[in-house]
Amino acid sequence: WRSDVMSPTASIAAERQADLNSGRDESRTLAEILAITHSALLTQVVPEAPEGLVEAARRADSLGILARMQTMGEALYTHLGHSACLDLADHPADTVRGWAVFALVSQEKDADVDTLLALVRPAADDPHFGVREWSWMAVRPHLAPRLDEAIRALRPWTSEPSERIRRFASESLRPRGVWARHIPALKKEPERGLPLLEPLRADSSRYVQDSVANWIN
């Protein structure tokens, strides 16, 4: 994803904005993802949301996009609990499914790497590009401190049939992730990532190849 996108609402019609905020439709572009008003979407998706959750969503509206998603995830888990967040993971709106992955990871951040990866795997293989991006952004902060363990656990993902899963194996630990904190250890010693990059460097999928190129550059 590029972080230098123009003002997200500049070219989005009011009717389309209303559809996005209602949760009736998926976003089609990054600009549409950025244009969503999360507090408005929440009131449509969870009309019985407690006031504390609504207030957290209002605060999230003014944050950067990654902080917005993290805040929504944590607030949803705090106020609605595990079962409700699992239900949201199957919602028709991509942003809501993104909230769910942040919510579930926020409560399992101290779990072992295999547990974390199993948790985000459905989102990593989601048909929507945005949800797939949220999946690695949600789990990356919890993989980075355990690099060797994470690289070992991700190695089998490099041979998965799904190009989405294979891409996740590379994207989740990119030394210079877009909108995500860099991983200094991999910037200093990028060769530590070779167990992931070697199997993927000649991947048949351009989607995967692009991630490997981004990892190296």
Which residues fall in each region the model found?
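Surface-facing alpha-helical segments and adjacent helix-coil boundary elements at the starts of domains
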Residues: 1-217
